[in-house]
Amino acid sequence: LDCNSIIYDSIRELHKSNLLKPAVADNYEPISALLCTKIQQYIDAIRPSNNVYIAFDGVAPFAKMNQQKSRRYRSAFLEHHNVIPKSTFNSALITPGTDFMNYLSKYVTARFSPKFIVSASDIPGEGEHKLFQHIRDNHLPDQNTVIYGLDADLLMLSIFHSDKTNLFVYRE
């Protein structure tokens, strides 16, 4: 499971139901709890018989850092000038090394380890790349592998790994 998109889904869901509190630190537990509920729902829907690998984006490769930085500045600029509605949650907190991501990593690890493998945001690399490294290192020819994530890179990486038989991408 490439889980960064699930973080954003959880924040949007709490925001729509007016459960997202103005104080950022007060949002850590509700977001983390909802995220774990959603992860469990995906696990229940997929019904894995073997391993579950839960990945969050860690520190990105240097080449991608400028892209991420400009995306964050653009969002802040658009919010500041009321082009897009202000959020009660600063999405820049969904960055490796922030208090929020450190809290979330510990929360998810406590909830799902040791039963499942959790590659938290303190482990470098984007979630989808960590997933495929795990597949390359551990894939068995007769094993079905289901990958969840909304990142466009996930589809490209899946195509590049088509030599791995029985590889499926689960998306909504």
Region spans (language model):
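Noncatalytic, typically N-terminal accessory segments of nucleic acid-processing enzymes
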Residues: 1-172
